[in-house]
């Protein structure tokens, strides 16, 4: 069953550009992963500090592989000091 994830990143004030760049650079190699069905990045219109990554994976195993790949590990190490809340990743299944 396909897995859809929503990752929420709340940038520290003044780190918006760095978070944006890190996210945009991270989604490029993720799109090439065999289990990735699609991945997009979003920036909130109402809160300039808030970013999202929406992704779809072939299944949960594909997402687990993604989470362990070097480019994902590097991205998390890069973005973690730039955000002021713990990273929130919701794993969901489509219901309609």
Predicted feature descriptions by range:
Residues 1-3, 18, 34-36:
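Short, flexible segments with low predicted structural confidence
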Residues 2-9, 40-67, 88:
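Short, well-ordered beta-strand segments in beta-rich or mixed alpha/beta enzyme
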Residues 11-16:
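Short, surface-exposed ligand-recognition loops at beta-strand->loop->(often short) alpha-helix junctions
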Residues 21-37, 56-89:
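An amphipathic, aromatic/His-enriched active-site/gating alpha helix that lines ligand/cofactor pockets
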Residues 91-96:
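Short hydrophobic/aromatic patches at helix-to-coil boundaries
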């Amino acid at each position: 069953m396909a897995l859809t994830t929503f990752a929420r990143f709340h940038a520290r004030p003044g780190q918006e550009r760095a978070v944006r760049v890190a996210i945009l650079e991270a989604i490029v190699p993720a799109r090439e992963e065999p289990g990735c069905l699609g991945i997009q990045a979003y920036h909130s219109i109402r809160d300039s500090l808030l970013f999202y990554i929406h992704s779809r994976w072939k299944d949960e195993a594909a997402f687990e592989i993604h989470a362990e790949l070097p480019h994902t590990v590097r991205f998390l190490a890069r973005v973690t000091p730039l955000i002021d809340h713990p990273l929130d990743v919701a794993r969901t299944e489509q219901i309609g």
